[in-house]
């Protein structure tokens, strides 16, 4: 059974989003997603300064099984990427909620309200 932290919001495409105190949004992939992917071997990170709309492809996670696009759960400008993943992509398997992929300055913070809460995500993945 997947771990689903109550304080996070989730996209149906299995990204999580956390609103930070400074108004930024931290993004990663869910425990369910990393389990489905298997051992992560490479993460293609977005460029800082790039602007995405909600649902835009914002990077790629490659595992021994597949390559999977990572989508921006909300629109905004990338203000940071987790460079640690370039050398240690397996961190997404080890700590899916501690290992973020990128941070956004959201263009419309209300988009977070359109994402699933923990219970909604749990229902989506059938757990």
Curated annotation (Swiss-Prot):
Domain spans labelled Lipoyl-binding: 24-105
Positions carrying N6-lipoyllysine: 65
InterPro entries documented for this protein: 2-oxoA_DH_lipoyl-BS (IPR003016), Biotin_lipoyl (IPR000089), GCV_H (IPR002930), GCV_H/Fam206 (IPR033753), GCV_H_sub (IPR017453), Single_hybrid_motif (IPR011053)
The keyword Methyltransferase belongs to this UniProt entry's keyword annotation: no
Cofactor (UniProt): (R)-lipoate
Cofactor note as given: Binds 1 lipoyl cofactor covalently.
Keywords: Lipoyl
CC terms in the record's Gene Ontology section: cytosol; glycine cleavage complex
Single Gene Ontology BP annotation: glycine decarboxylation via glycine cleavage system
Keyword Transit peptide attributed: no
Role of this protein: The glycine cleavage system catalyzes the degradation of glycine. The H protein shuttles the methylamine group of glycine from the P protein to the T protein.
Family listed: Belongs to the GcvH family.
Known partners and oligomeric status: The glycine cleavage system is composed of four proteins: P, T, L and H.
PANTHER family referenced in this protein's UniProt entry, alphabetically: GLYCINE CLEAVAGE SYSTEM H PROTEIN, GLYCINE CLEAVAGE SYSTEM H PROTEIN-RELATED
Protein name (record): Glycine cleavage system H protein 2
Gene: gcvH2
